[in-house]
Amino acid sequence: MGNYKPSIKQYVVTVKAIKSSQFGRLGICAVVLLFVLGYPFYFISNNPFDTSIRYQYVDPYNDTTRKYTTIEKQHTDIGGNGTTILYPKNLQLDQTALSQLLNTTETTNPFVQYIGNSSSIAFSQLNQTLVNHSIQVFDPFSNSDNCSDLMTETQLTISQNIIIKESFEIMVKRLMHQLDTEPAFKELAPFFQNKLSLHLRMRSYHKHFYKFARTSVWLKDYGVHLMISRVIYSQKGKKGDPQISLLYTQLYDTNWQELTNTDLLVSMQDITGEYKLEKLQFPRFLPMPFYYNPKLTKGRWYGPEDARIMLVKNQLDMEEPVVIYNSYHRQIANHTTTGKTDGSVELNFEFYRSMFVGWPFRYQLGKSNTDGFVDDRFDNVKFTRVAELKIHNQTRASIEKNWTPFVDPSERDPEDKSLYIVYQWDKLRILKCDISNLVTDDGFIHYSACRFKQDTKHDEVEKVGPIRGGTELIPTIINNKQLWVGFLRAHIDKCGCGKAMYRPNMVVLQKTDMGTFQVAYLSSYISFNIPVPGWKTHEIQCGKRDPNVLIPNGISNWEVATIDGIERDVLTMTLSAADEDNILMDIHGLKTVIKNLITNQKHGNEFNSDSVQMKCVVAYSIEFCRAYGEEQARLGLTGGWLPSHN
């Protein structure tokens, strides 16, 4: 027989001979085959190998050369009733009255009234091992263009830095509880793709959650630090590709031990403006209102970013925390008629990243002020009260960020009605924002009107300089001068260590006799002797495409203690390294350092307005970056890349 090639007619005859039951069996086999071949791809796409199969948990706090804080884990019943209720020392209510007020029992929820002093300084802080740390500061009181004429080298007295130990397990469990039980969080569930339980089982949360930018305030009537952190979640486990950002709040005692499952009894301001006693459980995610669409996540980072917490005086003459942050939101740009007989219109939106102020101890209903219009899903949902910080009579910019907040205690009556913002440090521009009387342009959405208190802007459009953001500014008076002290951050690209370098810069802002502001002193880069891990791989420093990041987040407290009859001030600040490690560090005797700078000022009061001071700070910071990169290359820690700078 030769080669046999069946004709199409023969194929048709063969097919007709197959019984229907055989077709059924073939169909079942095809479905099974598709499942066997296709399911692994579906599983991998939803449960990547790097997080679900080959992921091996590594304790991020196992470096024996570093010092860590502790976590009090006596109570970790997330969502349970076994919490301790802490109430302030100035509240005159017995525990029976408190039980009736909160509809609870002393047995189930023990009440604890704080009876300690108002100081945040712990005994351990006064007995730390301290070292001197040299910094270079520059003043503007000279007509010279020579940086050495503006520069003074001085010493800071600093403590060993401490990494704040985290429990991601507690945090993820708290998030799951809030997603299940709190209306403000339920609509956020799609961002997490039903994988939170998987992250807990596999202990893979460190690959998807990143917690940094921690900043805190001392609540003196409760004897606790209230700390707020930014938590980002990446579905793909990439730090540079998060889909959502949330704010997580925690409580710490004076020794920086975290207090879990603790309630604070606080005076909450409701939507009518009245104050009522309510208990807030910690740790918890703040129910911040923000615009989001879980179906559209590419290139959109939803949620609050770069939050800074600080204390202001409210109308009850009590200290109250406020949070300054930036967030992606939308507003109605215009509307067009649809041409339908029902008179309906089509809304057109614009999207922005703007600055906001939030009050953690106040509520609002709904989130129309971040979404641009009323959504009936949220009409009766309680969120943290927020307001946009908007420059009055000026078109809203597409992006606003890196504002530096402070208050002026001399203007209190009795509350802080205004919030000051350093909008730009180079060619100083300062806003004054009204936070006591919000305004509206459309009778619908209210915002805080910000007006320039000081503006040296030139006619040409200028880019934001490399020195920006940083901590809030803390007021003080030294040598009868009204000053504000903080730590900015300089962001310098391609200076000799990878893609960019971020480091702290100490700043002293001064109010002149004329009522204007000037930068009295500004330092170049400060290392604080803090080890900075690589951005992607901890062991690789100054990677070609990676930033090298140490950012100051906030000043937790700055107080004076008396030791053997001698007064010594202690400033505690928080920093973030590589957007992962959260660090505490103390500076002792900073007021003395500033007093000596003022007393020994080399020049008169003639102010150089040509930004020579800023140029010198940047130049010396670039030199720091170059030397740092060369040292990492010498040590073989750059992953094969040789640092270079422009």
UniProtKB/Swiss-Prot annotation:
Null allele outcome, as annotated, is: Leads to the production of phospholipomannan with short truncated oligomannosidic chain and impairs induction of TNF-alpha production in macrophages.
Protein origin, superkingdom:
Eukaryota
Q: Please give the record's induction comment.
A: Expression is induced in biofilm.
One example of the protein's molecular function in GO is: mannosyltransferase activity
Cysteine-cysteine disulfides: none
Q: How does it sit in the membrane?
A: Single-pass type II membrane protein
Q: Which Enzyme Commission number(s) are on file for it? A: 2.4.1.-
Compartments reported by the entry: Membrane
Keyword Transmembrane assigned = yes
Could you list the residue ranges that cross the membrane?
Answer: 26-46
Alphabetical keyword list:
Cell wall biogenesis/degradation, Glycoprotein, Glycosyltransferase, Membrane, Signal-anchor, Transferase, Transmembrane, Transmembrane helix, Virulence
Q: What is its main location?
A: membrane
Q: Which residues lie on this side of the membrane: Extracellular?
A: 47-646
Q: What family does the Swiss-Prot or TrEMBL record give for this protein?
A: Belongs to the BMT family.
Q: What is this protein called?
A: Beta-mannosyltransferase 6
Query: Which organism is this entry from?
Result: Candida albicans (strain SC5314 / ATCC MYA-2876)
